[in-house]
Amino acid sequence: MALPFVVVLPLLIVVAAGVYYIYNEVIRFMSKSLVRNKVVVITDAVSGVGTECAHLFHKGGARLILGGTNWDKLESLYDSLTSDADPRETFAPKLVILDFSDMDSMEDVVSEVLECYGCVDLLICNSSMKLKAPIQSVSLEMDRNIMDVNYFGPSALAKGVLPTMISRRSGHILLVNSIQGRLAVPFRSSYAASKHAAQAFFDCLRAEVEEYGIVVSTISHTFIDASHHPLAAGEPAPKTNALAAFIASQLTHGVRPSVLANEILQTVNRKRKEVVLAHPIPRVALCLRSFCPPFLFAVLAAGVKDSVLTEQM
């Protein structure tokens, strides 16, 4: 006797979920094994995403070179990585002070990075500087600082390690960018400009180095949701328009550092050239920017007048 459909359907769902889980576990295991012995540079290892990447790649057996602007934080990360690690399976990380806001130091930084192991297999550029302000209030000096950290720094480091990658005809350069490298929103003029510049640079680089077997990847994500900030005790919740509040929540519903770090690992192992980590509304906005820009411009202009969107974008 055939089983009723109402019985078969739940069984199929359970079996499919089990297969999907096993598949993900196998892929995750293979991903870690693929980075073993690889020389991996993380430009901002002390950030939330950088720390997650450091733990992930360290467990996978990569030879890490960890960059950051704060030596104490780098040493703390070093201790957390090595305290419970098996020295037979992992390598002690190398630490390098790396500050993209100091462009005069970049030549020395490149030399120090290459001296660690003589080459770089994977460069992860995840350093970033953010700013939210009306255009007229942003000084030219601040514009330059943001361009140094978000564009000139990553591009200079990529140029610095490129000759060794070309000579070995292998390597991977990954830019952790932002959705605002594709879509500019109000009050993020300097930040969006720097991210657009970085996106364009690495897109050009990808085409130029493909013949040498070098992979260039970009990951465009919404904001990184490192923590939740509830309202202070006794603080009244602001009155907002329901539709505007929904749109704002979608635009600012960020990516957790652990999720982004796993995506970085998957991107490296699958050699993806471009990844967009965004929820439906930013994706729709990207489509509107391409196919119906006047409508998007009108929505953004109207959003500036709405207190909710102004605060959340």
Give the positions of each predicted feature.
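SDR active-site lid
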Residues: 207-280
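Active-site helix of classical SDR
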Residues: 158, 194
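Rossmann-fold cofactor-recognition segment
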Residues: 84-104
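Conserved glycine-rich cofactor-binding loop
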Residues: 39, 46-47
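Residue(s) in the substrate-gating loop at a strand-loop-helix junction
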Residues: 178
